[in-house]
């Protein structure tokens, strides 16, 4: 508390943290930003990545659909949902939503949102993450991973590592 630094995110401590995260990810080219909370992160990420007519796909139990009091909808983006399977999204759900929105006069899906771990305490294995990412790539969708509970998943043997999450998603955060 006795040290003067420049504004949050621009100080030497944040730079050291960014350098450590880049080293863990084994990628010097990643963008790292510090935000104040999960809802704000979800809202900022979704609203900045999507155009006005685009939507995000989530399971019905997804945090952005149930617990964030309309934050995403406040930005003008619709959340398209499917009933979860143990709290999780599967590629078939994504494909089904894509088939349901073929018309230019409908909201256009552009992002898939998942949480690692889920609202039900389940988690995505590396293989499940790869399958979802492949489905997103096939459908030209971004994959966004809510990492508010990521620490719980990182200790599991068959869950993706941070490096693997960086490979098989377009954006994720560490809560």
Regions found by a protein language model. Give the residues of each.
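Conserved PLP-enzyme active-site core in the AAT-like
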Residues: 1-175
């Amino acid at each position: 508390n006795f040290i003067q630094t420049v504004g949050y995110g621009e100080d030497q401590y944040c730079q050291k943290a960014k350098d450590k995260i880049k080293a863990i990810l084994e990628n010097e080219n990643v963008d790292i930003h510090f935000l104040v909370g999960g809802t704000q992160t979800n809202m900022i990420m979704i609203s900045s990545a999507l155009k006005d007519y685009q939507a995000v796909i989530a399971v019905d139990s997804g945090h952005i659909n149930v617990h964030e009091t309309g934050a995403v909808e406040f930005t003008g983006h619709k959340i398209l949902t499917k009933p979860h399977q143990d709290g999780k999204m599967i590629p078939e759900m994504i494909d089904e939503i894509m088939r349901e929105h073929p018309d230019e006069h409908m909201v256009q899906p552009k992002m898939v949102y998942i949480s690692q771990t889920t609202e039900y305490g389940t988690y995505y294995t590396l293989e499940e993450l790869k399958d979802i990412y492949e489905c997103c790539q096939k459908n030209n969708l971004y994959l966004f991973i809510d990492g508010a509970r990521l620490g719980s998943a990182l200790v599991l043997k068959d869950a993706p590592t941070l490096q693997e999450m960086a490979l098989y998603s377009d954006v994720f955060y560490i809560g």
